[in-house]
A protein has these predicted regions:
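Short glycine-aspartate micro-motif
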Residues: 17-21
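Short, glycine-/Ser/Thr-/acidic-enriched flexible segments
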Residues: 24-25, 34, 164-165
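Helical "lid/coupling" subdomains associated with nucleotide-phosphate turnover
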Residues: 5-13, 31, 39, 64, ...
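Short glycine-rich, Thr/Ser-proximal phosphate-binding strand/loop in the N-terminal lobe
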Residues: 35-69
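Short acidic, Gly/Ser-rich segments with clustered Asp/Glu that frequently serve as metal-coordination loops
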Residues: 24-28, 46
Length: 218
């Protein structure tokens, strides 16, 4: 619930807020109204599920297998980065390495546009649907909780946690994502008080997802 406090401090207009903290193994959700925490829940469906299955120990993943060849070619002349990549075998660990690559000091001389994993995924039409389904599944689950609790559509949804970085693959436009989210709520019959929804935590000017989690605890 730490991100709840942070976003209420940063957003004076926040009234009905759902905080979604996506980690590697779990997604933690908190429902709040006017700064008061009303309900919390957690479920084992998070970013790692995009890159590996909890049902088997397979080291194969279509997304990672495809992009590993591309990234390997970009960093082939940087031993430090090659060693890190070669030392990771789990697809989820490789994905974390890819997402952090452009911020790695060892990659400072590389063109950021060619090692930006967010952009590579966003521009790829084959795998984007996987991330859209991932996001839709989370929002669907939250909609079911709202219906069960008799709660209306939130005015704001805030995202935090390193796992929420994958949502930027869908779009970098928070307003577009908000429209898509509203449509899901509407289709499932969630009451809309004013029909307005704002997505927080994913914009370029917002704090990083991990920072939002940490700052809320301060």
């Amino acid at each position: 619930a730490a991100p709840i406090q942070y976003f209420f401090r940063q957003n004076a207009t926040a009234t009905r807020l759902v905080s979604i903290d996506i980690g590697g193994g779990t997604t933690d959700v908190a429902f709040a109204k006017d700064g008061d925490l009303q309900h919390v829940t957690s479920f084992k469906f998070a970013s790692n599920d995009l890159f590996e299955s909890s049902l088997d120990a397979s080291l194969r993943n279509g997304i990672i297998d495809y992009f590993k060849k591309i990234v390997e070619n970009k960093i082939k002349d940087i031993d430090e980065l090659k060693k890190i990549l070669d030392s990771n075998t789990k697809p989820s660990n490789i994905a974390s390495f890819f997402f952090s690559l452009q911020e790695n000091p060892a990659a400072s001389d590389l063109d950021k546009s060619v090692i930006n994993f967010d952009s590579l995924l966003r521009e790829d039409e084959h795998f984007k649907i996987v991330f859209i389904i991932f996001y839709t599944a989370i929002i669907y689950h939250i909609a079911q909780i709202l219906l069960l609790m008799g709660m209306p559509m939130p005015r704001h949804i805030s995202f935090s946690g390193n796992g929420s970085k994958v949502l930027r693959v869908i779009t970098s436009d928070s307003k577009l994502l908000a429209k898509f989210t509203c449509k899901i709520f509407q289709l499932l019959g969630v009451e809309a008080v004013d029909g307005k929804l704002e997505i927080l935590g994913l914009g370029v000017d917002d704090s990083s997802p991990k920072q939002a989690t940490c700052k809320g605890a301060l």
